[in-house]
Each structure stands twice: as structure tokens, then as C-alpha cells.
Amino acid sequence: KGNKLGLSKIAYNFLGGVLNCTQPLSAFFNPTINSYRRINAPPTKSGATWSPSTISYSGNNRTHMIRIPDPGRFELRLMDGATNPYLLQAGVIAAGLEGINKRMDPGEPIMVNMYTHEKDYPNLNKLPNELEEALQYLDDNKELKEAFGESVIKSYIKLKNQEITSFN
């Protein structure tokens, strides 16, 4: 049985898993140093950044990381064009299945403009501020290490750290 946003209980559990793993998944979703410049961009003159900075969800509201525009589906708005599509999909599926298996509750949707009301929600988890922080979250996450295999995660982190060193 769904609710006013039109998702089933299982879909909410899936959503809960994705929200729970967002910080480590950010290493896949936003795999470059410049990715975090987009996430942490200051608001434009219009008052929007068009990029989420908090781990939150809502209805048809683009100011949140996840929006539910229509019954039966949700849109994950975090990743950028540099993401590896295979790691992205595998990460979302792994996190979502973890949410289903553990019956994770995503909490209530936040039905406000997060660009103007973010300060009203100081307890919301924030997205990582830089790639190094996202990689640390990934390295600390046992669920994704189990889903991908520890050697895959370690190799990915090593590669990204080499890219960071080359960039600097």
C-alpha cells in the first residue's frame, strides 16, 4: 500500500537504503574534484544552485537530493556526468536492497524549498564537501564493501587518490 506520494512500502525501504548510503555512494556518483564544486556551489541570483547539498527527499521538488515527481517512481538527483554508469547502478541497487532487507525507513519527506530553508533542518546529513571525504565514507562502509567486494572498493579508492594527487 502506498501513501500520498505514491510509493509502496518496499519502495520506501529501498529509498531508505539509498538515503542511508548516500555519503559513501557519493564517491561513485561524484567521482571528480570538480563534482564537489557543483554540489557546494553558492546559490545563484535566482536563489538556486540546481544541485542538492543535503541528504533529503520530497515530492516534486528539485531542491532535494531525491524527488518523487509522480506515483511509482523517484529521481535521484545527485550524480553528475562524470559518474561511471555501471558503478552508479550497482551502488543504487546494493543500497536499495540493503534498505529492503533491513526495512529501512527514510523518514518523512521534507516539503520545503531546501535552498531557502536548509538552515531550518540542522540535523539533516550533508553531502560530502570533497572527493577525499566521500572516499573516506566509502572506505568505512561495510555494506558496499560486501556488495562490491573489498578489493573493488580498495582499488577504486586507490585510483581516485592517484587522481587527486595528480590534480594537486
PLM region spans:
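Acidic, glycine-enriched catalytic cores built around paired aspartates
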Residues: V112-N168
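Active-site capping/gating regions of soluble enzymes
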Residues: K1-I110, E118-L124
